[in-house]
Amino acid sequence: PIFGITNTHKDFAWLPQALESLISAEMWYPMITATVGHTYRQIVNKYYDLTCDDNVPRRRALGNFDFRGDMGVDAALKASAGWLLSFVNTATVPAIPFMKEMYNCDYSTEEVGFGAVSTEHFVMCSNSAIDIVNNPDDTYEYKDIDPMRERVFLKRLLTELYPNTSFSCVCDSYDYWNVVKNILPTLKDEILTHNGC
């Protein structure tokens, strides 16, 4: 157990269990996300040491995007606060003032958390339709909305929209493994020359 409360008075034998339940319910979720974040940070540190030859801040290596899928605003704030102990990228922007309140962070002078440039499923899916409408004479071989059409938008993200900043990209709108195995290898040059963080 993470903590224990011992009863010291026979008339209050019920109190420790009640308090333990309340405290555990409030602490468990942020502790889990803090532990996961810390574990991921150890992995990031290890592989940055082995593979990176630049000064990219390790605290910016990963981000959490759980706000929309969490169990409510309170849960999202606590989960993101746990994550922000190891990394600074979050889609749960309200967690930044929460960190100030709970951890006495001064986000005017220190890196507490940042929102990240990122795509969403809707953006990735609708871009194919927009691309087809805007380019009716396109000679691209995939004329219909097709998973391979994601390549067009991924290239645009890398070379036109965000050529000088890092961004997060949803890659599972159609077929995640198609993106990893087939699309990203064709964009190797664009990825390697991209001027992200």
Task: Describe these PLM feature segments.
Residues F3-C197:
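Buried, small/hydrophobic-residue-enriched core segments of structured protein domains
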